[in-house]
A protein has these predicted regions:
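A solvent-exposed, acidic/Ser-Thr-rich amphipathic alpha-helical stretch
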Residues: 23-79, 125
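Short, cysteine-centered beta-strand-loop-beta hairpins and adjacent loop/turn segments enriched
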Residues: 64-65, 89-99
Length: 134
């Protein structure tokens, strides 16, 4: 069993940001699941790596590829990690429509790969998140 470290978590996100599927598969399991919070068209469970990557592509499309996460902290346990991020972006075609929220991503790991992820949004960020993606 691979040890979860802050470096491993960062490498997983770096692979995801690269868009290189071969690199992504080193850290994200093919049978992973991901829960997108809120009540908007993107919300709900994403099944498998393809479902998750499809969600990420839609985030890029809707934000004109402006969406990014500034990682503030990473916490780890034997089979899970939680990272605190500031998620920022603006809606494609509407520069005034901005997203700026604080989020925790809770990740469960198996054999060095993410098998489950869930997002949690702080404070009034949930309303902002829903309005941004709706």
């Amino acid at each position: 069993m691979a040890q979860i470290t802050p470096e491993l978590v960062q490498q997983a996100y770096d692979a995801l940001a690269s868009g290189d599927r071969e690199q992504i598969r080193k850290y994200w399991a093919d049978d992973m699941i991901w829960l997108v919070p809120g009540h908007n068209p993107l919300s709900g469970w994403k099944q498998g790596l393809d479902g998750f990557l499809g969600f990420m592509q839609e985030v890029g499309r809707l934000s004109g590829n402006s969406f990014h996460m500034d990682r503030e902290a990473i916490m780890i346990s034997s089979d899970a990690s939680a990272d605190v991020t500031r998620n920022i972006g603006n809606r494609a075609g509407d520069e005034a429509r901005k997203l700026d929220i604080n989020v925790i991503h809770y990740l469960r790991w198996r054999d060095g790969k993410v098998i489950e992820g869930r997002g949690a949004i702080f404070g009034d960020g949930t309303a902002q998140y829903d309005a941004f993606w709706s």
